[in-house]
Amino acid sequence: MARAKFERTKPHVNIGTIGHVDHGKTTLTAAITMTLAAQGKAKARNYEDIDAAPEEKARGITINTAHVEYETDSRHYAHVDCPGHADYVKNMITGAAQMDGGILVVSAADGPMPQTREHILLAKQVGVPNLVVFLNKQDMVDDEELLELVELEVRELLTEYGFDGDNIPIVAGSALQAVEALKANPKIAKGDNEWTDKILALMDEVDAYIPEPEREIDKPFLMAVEDVFSISGRGTVATGRIERGKVKVGETVEIVGIRATSSTTVTGVEMFQKTLEEGLAGDNVGLLLRGVKKEDIERGMVIAKPGSITPHTQFEGEVYVLTKEEGGRHTPFFKNYKPQFYVRTTDVTGSIVDYTSDEGETVEMVMPGDRIKMTVELINPIAIEQGMRFAIREGGRTIGAGVVSKILK
């Protein structure tokens, strides 16, 4: 049989498994690929393959992540699974593997544990909009009431962190039983095995509950300025990569950040020395701007659809601080520490006003390897939005990675 080529006919969604260590995230990932492989919609991956996740670098941080892909009748999924807890924290904060939704795995035998709580909090902070729950290890719970109790506990926890705990789909099953059954018979059809059917039921919920993400090209236009030069007789050109949306010749745009916001008209879009009618998300372009002097615009500003983004100086961020081994600091830092915040294309000096723990208590000292919530005050206003990623740098080296969880001012 000839190999079918990859058809981009189905909508694509990025998801991942989250939850406490040893609750069965990787086993579930294996079970999903094996169950869907039995229907010809995935390549079966066993636990060992997924667990030996390769190292990746994102924003100067090493993260172990396994990527698998599979399809359901209606969608194509890219699924990430991390072997270690620290990898999850780094992955979610750096956005190395963007998630449109997550499958929260909770062991029915143990109920929610500290990392269950931490991953739900992180999902909320970094903007993973929707979760579906898999209550794993159902085969180890004989008492139906106990299962209901765990479900209730999970729903309360989700509600506590601002998710729709009452309506989030929860499916109980056993990833291990499904994997064992599929090892014995890789071609199990729907309806032949209660455990693999539960995996299919979970995927039905994921299909139905996790909405399709808005495509980058459909979002409002934004390009971070990387370089600026003047072309005599034509005006000023700002270059950069279009982060989202599209821009056409003749459109009005705003220049945001560092100085007062100004507006101008795009009189030309160029790519590789060729003129275009429009630039699209992902393109590296030069924009010719009417009536803008070279000194009016600099790296670190953004050019965006009018009214779509505003400059700010104060925000709350969820930050992972690099360890010494990762090339971070060797010593802790304290309040009023003044590093550089690298946002999109530029470093801006800022001062850290305070630190807060997950429990909402003030923290005096932050150690390398910590994850912490911090309030940052920048010396210059720049275009910032919720969910935006940034790096914290000191003398040109990255010492932390963060995501904006709330804009204050």
From Swiss-Prot:
Residue numbers spanned by region G5: 174-176
Domain tr-type G: from-to ranges: 10-214
Residues that bind GTP: 19-26, 81-85, 136-139
Cellular location(s): Cytoplasm
Record field: catalytic activity: GTP + H2O = GDP + phosphate + H(+)
EC number: 3.6.5.3
GO cellular-component term (any): cytosol
Region (G4): 136-139
A molecular function (GO) term: GTP binding
UniProt keyword annotations, A-Z: Cytoplasm, Elongation factor, GTP-binding, Hydrolase, Magnesium, Metal-binding, Nucleotide-binding, Protein biosynthesis
Amino acids binding Mg(2+): T26
UniProt keyword annotation of GTP-binding present: yes
Region called G3, residue ranges: 81-84
Location of the region described as G2 in the Swiss-Prot/TrEMBL record: 60-64
Region (G1): 19-26
Binding partners and assembly: Monomer.
NCBIfam families, sorted: EF-Tu, PRK00049.1, PRK12735.1, PRK12736.1, small_GTP
Family to which this protein belongs: Belongs to the TRAFAC class translation factor GTPase superfamily. Classic translation factor GTPase family. EF-Tu/EF-1A subfamily.
Function statement: GTP hydrolase that promotes the GTP-dependent binding of aminoacyl-tRNA to the A-site of ribosomes during protein biosynthesis.
Name used for this protein in its record: Elongation factor Tu
